[in-house]
């Protein structure tokens, strides 16, 4: 899923080239390239599909030439994650009704790729022959207020007292739990209570379910969305598909998959995992994933000199020389003709400043 605009990462991320297409970490690969790469031993490249805005088609083809052009699906407008998932699921289902699907954002990072691949492999085994939805829950390491949370069911593994089992124990994934509830982004005190209580996981927005289950669930829970694709589906794999998509996709409800399905379905399970995940949603989160110098400065750029600076994050990927003196706890970011200098604690205002 690669249609977002990454507005919190301005000026590095812009509507013309959002963060999923940028070498955020300064390692020579964009986030979408890293995303496709970490699936490459689990899912063959011929089974990779990209859903993005039609304005990003050329960027996707340039950065991922190995993905067949026919598997780059173009949204004529933004309609959130539920229409995105319905679009690609219905198209795959039309030709491959037994398909097992993984949905992943294109702009996240994973530090422990080997563990990630093992989790995905186990997840696909779990969902292959079950009518369930599996979501990955990240083990929380701090009381984070920037993520939604997943509450795992706390029932015991026993039926001696007539209690229904809430855990599906399998040889491949014995720690998979039924989901009790999805929680919105909490305040700090609530986030602390989640950590103290246990059984709460960060919602990574990574979902695994088979194509039949996607089609059935959305038809039951979001019939107005399903009806749009009932109209579109006969034109899949025909020359008229782009025209029909442009005509009907804008009529889809603007709704997230979390609100449309995950919070309502009774068949959602969570797989707790720990593979160094971050959604890189803010400059602050990027700072924690970059190497830091002896003064806790993190920088991405070819020619940066920091003098008497502390706790700063600097992202200036151009070749121009950058000299910064005397700043503490600042964000310095440059892109094309725009330069941002702001205090870290004020970064939530960045979305407003770019308007």
What do the PLM-derived regions correspond to, one by one?
Residues 1-2, 51, 102-105, 135-139, ...:
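Short beta-strand segments
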Residues 32, 88, 107, 150, ...:
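Residue-level signal for inorganic ion chemistry
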Residues 168-169:
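Intrinsic, low-complexity polybasic segments
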Residues 113-157, 174-249, 269, 319, ...:
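Conserved core of the sugar-phosphate nucleotidyltransferase
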Residues 211-213, 218-355:
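Left-handed beta-helix
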Residues 8-11, 15, 25-105, 111-121:
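Conserved N-terminal catalytic core of the sugar/cofactor nucleotidyltransferase
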Residues 155-165:
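Arg/Gly-rich low-complexity intrinsically disordered repeat tracts
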